């Protein structure tokens, strides 16, 4: 994961300060790219402990086409809670509940979750129902039947529905590529990258998706290529980034998928294993909402 650490260092030394939507401020560079060869190990960051369970459940949630946080909260994954909570706080039903109390109510009260756990037509909706098109099923079918196609694309950026989303897609567009060695690669374009909190999560998530699609299309894994538009470090993450840059990376872990799974929608959390993951301690930071 030296590629990722090099990006952090590059932004620190060459980036410029920008004001942003969250009013926190960032150090930012535009148009960065890194490549991760999955044959060399699974690219899960080792210079801080990563929330592997959350990464897996979020991807499975996307693949279900789900856009309500209840599935995530029921599995103790709370990475999306802040956005619907901010919407709830503006409602007439808000009685001063904390984020923790809001999350507990999502878990315990299905009616409340249905009303206030919804994020709008975010990733899962666009992946599985982009104006009636199941993009995941379509791209897998195309990889199987027309692997040389230059149209192996999935887009979460639906301009007509952006205003209905709790958060417009940051990782907006990805394309698959099959080479002459029957290796499947994935290239993600991410319009906005929170380099400390979000990007390591995205690297692992799309590398997992690549691995799952490779299995169900009978291909080998190739590269994950990650292009980031506005690559930024939030001003309140600088100390955490410095701590991380002082740490030496460990050897990458190995991803093991249940080989009996032939349909991508049949994967469960129990079908995904990580072997020999060794990392440094967790580094906590606040998410910008």
UniProtKB/Swiss-Prot annotation:
Pathway: Pyrimidine metabolism; dTTP biosynthesis
Active site positions: 170
GO cellular component term of the entry, any: cytosol
UniProt-listed Enzyme Commission number(s): 2.1.1.45
Source organism superkingdom: Bacteria
Keyword terms: Cytoplasm, Methyltransferase, Nucleotide biosynthesis, Transferase
Protein residues bound to (6R)-5,10-methylene-5,6,7,8-tetrahydrofolate: 194, 288
Disulfide bonds: none
InterPro entries listed in its UniProt record: Thymidate_synth/dCMP_Mease, Thymidate_synth/dCMP_Mease_dom, Thymidate_synth/dCMP_Mease_sf, Thymidylate_synthase, Thymidylate_synthase_AS
GO MF entries: thymidylate synthase activity
Reactions mediated catalytically: dUMP + (6R)-5,10-methylene-5,6,7,8-tetrahydrofolate = 7,8-dihydrofolate + dTMP
Binding site for dUMP: 21, 150-151, 191-194, 202, 232-234
Entry's localization field: Cytoplasm
Keyword Transferase: yes
UniProt similarity note: Belongs to the thymidylate synthase family. Bacterial-type ThyA subfamily.
NCBIfam families: PRK01827.1-2, thym_sym
Full protein name: Thymidylate synthase
Upper taxonomic lineage: Bacteria, Bacillati, Mycoplasmatota, Mycoplasmoidales, Metamycoplasmataceae
This protein's encoding gene: thyA
């Amino acid at each position: 994961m030296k590629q990722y650490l090099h990006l952090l260092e590059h932004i620190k030394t060459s980036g410029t300060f920008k004001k942003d939507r969250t009013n926190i401020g960032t150090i930012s560079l535009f148009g960065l790219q890194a490549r991760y060869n999955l044959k060399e190990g699974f690219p899960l960051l080792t210079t801080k402990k990563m929330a592997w369970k959350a990464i897996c459940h979020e991807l499975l949630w996307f693949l279900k086409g789900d856009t309500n946080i209840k599935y995530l909260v029921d599995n103790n994954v709370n990475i999306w809670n802040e956005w619907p909570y901010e919407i709830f706080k503006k409602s007439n039903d808000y009685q001063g509940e904390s984020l923790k109390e809001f999350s507990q109510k999502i878990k315990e009260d299905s009616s409340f979750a249905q009303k206030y756990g919804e994020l709008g037509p975010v990733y899962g909706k666009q992946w599985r129902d982009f104006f009636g098109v199941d993009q995941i099923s379509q791209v897998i079918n195309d990889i199987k039947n027309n692997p040389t196609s230059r149209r192996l694309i999935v887009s979460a950026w639906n301009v007509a529905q952006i205003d209905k989303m709790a958060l417009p897609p940051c990782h907006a567009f990805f394309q698959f590529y099959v080479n002459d060695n029957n290796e499947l690669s994935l290239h993600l374009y991410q319009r906005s990258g929170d380099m400390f909190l979000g990007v390591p999560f995205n690297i692992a998530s799309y590398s997992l998706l690549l691995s799952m699609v490779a299995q169900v299309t009978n291909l080998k894994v190739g590269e994950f290529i990650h292009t980031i538009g506005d690559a930024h470090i939030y001003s309140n993450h600088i100390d955490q980034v410095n701590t991380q840059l002082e740490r030496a990376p460990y050897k990458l872990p190995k991803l093991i998928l249940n080989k009996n799974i032939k349909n991508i929608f049949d994967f469960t959390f129990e079908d995904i294993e990580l072997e020999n993951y060794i990392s440094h301690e967790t580094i906590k930071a606040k998410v910008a909402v």
